[in-house]
């Protein structure tokens, strides 16, 4: 019985480990998600690959995408733009494929308005001390940027109430296990499968 794919939105404050958790999810065979690659104007970090981690584009190209309604969501964060190309997401969901979006909290809010049936998970740190430790250890930000990220994180954590689930990223393995349980439960929720069974009954 074919049905619409599941849209999973993974969000949380900067430095919480969204990218690390996402990568671990993609590697696990238990997950069958298609990953939507975001577009950004920020410079690549060491090890990041264009077209795999992000589409790294110029500011002019990003503005062109906004004007052409090519983005599901977009936002500016610490001087850089981030956005999710719309067409690939729609195509994969219509084909019955599950799609994983890893985006910031403002982007998630935009997606919620356009695709309210998505599953929204807020990834949170064990505490703010650990969050700052992770940002500092990343070694890519100045003290000024780190302070900006921590100030923003305090605001973003309070936005958790707009999500369906909260997952603590104490360890990547634990976070992935919790998300796996959420995905399994969401796939068998009656609102998601009832039409399949209605059609099955009609066919008989």
From Swiss-Prot:
Q: Which UniProt keywords apply?
A: ATP-binding, Cytoplasm, Kinase, Nucleotide-binding, Transferase
**Protein residues bound to ATP:** 12-19
Organism domain of life: Bacteria
Which Pfam families does this chain map to?
Guanylate_kin (PF00625)
Molecular function terms, GO-annotated: ATP binding; guanylate kinase activity
The record's listing under PROSITE patterns reads:
GUANYLATE_KINASE_1, GUANYLATE_KINASE_2
Q: Which PANTHER family match?
A: GUANYLATE KINASE (PTHR23117:SF13), GUANYLATE KINASE-RELATED (PTHR23117)
What does this chain do?
A: Essential for recycling GMP and indirectly, cGMP.
Protein name (record): Guanylate kinase
What species is this protein from?
Answer: Lactobacillus johnsonii (strain CNCM I-12250 / La1 / NCC 533)
């Amino acid at each position: 019985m074919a049905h619409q794919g599941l849209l999973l939105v993974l969000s949380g404050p900067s430095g919480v480990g969204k990218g690390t958790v996402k990568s671990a999810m993609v590697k696990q065979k238990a997950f069958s998600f298609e990953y939507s690659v975001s577009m950004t104007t920020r410079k690549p970090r060491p090890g990041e690959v264009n077209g795999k981690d992000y589409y790294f584009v110029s500011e002019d190209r990003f503005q062109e995408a906004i004007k052409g309604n090519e983005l599901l969501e977009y936002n500016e964060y610490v001087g850089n733009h981030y956005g999710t190309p719309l067409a690939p997401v729609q195509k994969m969901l219509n084909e019955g494929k599950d799609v994983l979006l890893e985006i910031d909290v403002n982007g998630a809010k935009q997606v919620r308005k356009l695709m309210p049936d998505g599953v929204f998970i807020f990834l949170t740190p064990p505490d703010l001390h650990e969050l700052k430790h992770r940002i500092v250890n990343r070694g890519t930000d100045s003290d000024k940027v780190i302070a900006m990220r921590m100030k923003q994180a305090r605001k973003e954590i309070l936005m958790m109430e707009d999500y369906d689930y909260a997952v603590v990223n104490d360890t990547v393995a634990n976070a992935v296990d919790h998300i796996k349980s959420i995905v399994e439960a969401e796939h068998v929720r009656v609102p998601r499968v009832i039409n399949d069974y209605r059609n099955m009954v009609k066919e008989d």
